């Protein structure tokens, strides 16, 4: 995995709790996040898991919340390289688009995990 992709920051979109992203089952979710999204497992029990990639740490939780209502953003070093990594793994990320925030351009793409959590990957 190229180092220039580097996950730098994570934040919630809406009411999503970054340390408790909702999943239906911890085991399959950990498999997806590690094998497909490139995270490393830090800790796990029956209903929760903590994962890390570079400078970013997230949590998964079987907490009764609807994964389809959860979303978060990740700031990465090279959004195009990450898009290629995920495309090669069959994740089917959305197109990379250039947008503006506060008059400054940034690159972005979106992807969903199997339970429905939506991710926004950005490069400022």
Task: Please describe what each predicted stretch is.
Residues 33:
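Terminal peptide-recognition signature
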Residues 36-41, 90-93:
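Conserved acetyl-CoA-binding loop of GNAT-fold acetyltransferases
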Residues 1-11, 15-24, 50-52, 63-124, ...:
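Vicinal oxygen chelate
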Residues 40-45, 97-100:
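Conserved catalytic-core motifs of GNAT/GCN5-like acyltransferases
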Residues 43-45, 62-63, 123-124:
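Acetyl-CoA-dependent GNAT
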Residues 1-30, 57, 70-72:
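N-terminal beta-strand motif that seeds the catalytic metal site of vicinal oxygen chelate
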């Amino acid at each position: 995995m190229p180092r220039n992709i580097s996950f730098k920051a994570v934040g919630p979109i809406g009411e999503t709790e970054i340390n408790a992203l909702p999943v239906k089952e911890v085991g399959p979710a950990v498999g997806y996040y590690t094998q497909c999204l490139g995270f490393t497992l830090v800790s796990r029990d029956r209903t929760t898991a903590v994962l890390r990639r570079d400078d970013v740490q997230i949590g998964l939780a079987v907490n009764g919340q609807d994964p389809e209502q959860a979303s978060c953003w990740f700031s990465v070093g090279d959004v195009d390289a990450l898009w290629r990594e995920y495309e090669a793994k069959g994740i089917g990320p959305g197109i990379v688009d250039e947008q503006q925030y506060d008059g400054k351009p940034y690159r972005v793409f979106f992807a969903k995990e199997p339970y429905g959590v939506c991710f926004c990957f950005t490069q400022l």
